[in-house]
Amino acid sequence: MGSMSPVHWLILAVVLLVVFGGGGKISGLMGDFAKGIKSFKKNMADDESMTATDATQAPGHISPPNQNPGYSQTTSSETHRNQV
């Protein structure tokens, strides 16, 4: 009971690192973390506004496929017939 276990030594080491060397680094990390959360929330709000804009478009509107006038699709049997 009187001796310190490895868990106690680990906690003591972390506390000493924070007190003597990591105070500024930890506050910087927390600031970066907060900026990341704010950016995430902002982007989520932007996505929701884009979804609302998409929902206002006509529900039956389907854009036509791209038409390439210089391209004709041929099957492999047609190609084989043309080569023989």
Curated annotation (Swiss-Prot):
The keyword Amino-acid biosynthesis does not apply. It is found in: Cell inner membrane. The keyword Cell inner membrane applies. Residues 64-77 have a biased composition (Polar residues). One of its GO terms (cellular component) is TAT protein transport complex. Its main location: membrane. Keywords: Cell inner membrane, Cell membrane, Membrane, Protein transport, Translocation, Transmembrane, Transmembrane helix, Transport. Residues 46-84 are annotated as: Disordered. Gene3D superfamilies: 1.20.5.3310. One of its GO terms (biological process) is protein transport by the Tat complex. The chain crosses the membrane at residues 4-24. It is a single-pass membrane protein. One of its GO terms (molecular function) is protein transmembrane transporter activity. It holds the Pfam family TatA_B_E. The Tat system comprises two distinct complexes: a TatABC complex, containing multiple copies of TatA, TatB and TatC subunits, and a separate TatA complex, containing only TatA subunits. Substrates initially bind to the TatABC complex, which probably triggers association of the separate TatA complex to form the active translocon. PANTHER family: SEC-INDEPENDENT PROTEIN TRANSLOCASE PROTEIN TATA. HAMAP family: TatA_E (MF_00236). Part of the twin-arginine translocation (Tat) system that transports large folded proteins containing a characteristic twin-arginine motif in their signal peptide across membranes. TatA could form the protein-conducting channel of the Tat system. Belongs to the TatA/E family. This is Sec-independent protein translocase protein TatA. It comes from Gluconobacter oxydans (strain 621H) (Gluconobacter suboxydans). The lineage of its organism: Bacteria, Pseudomonadati, Pseudomonadota, Alphaproteobacteria, Acetobacterales. The gene is tatA.
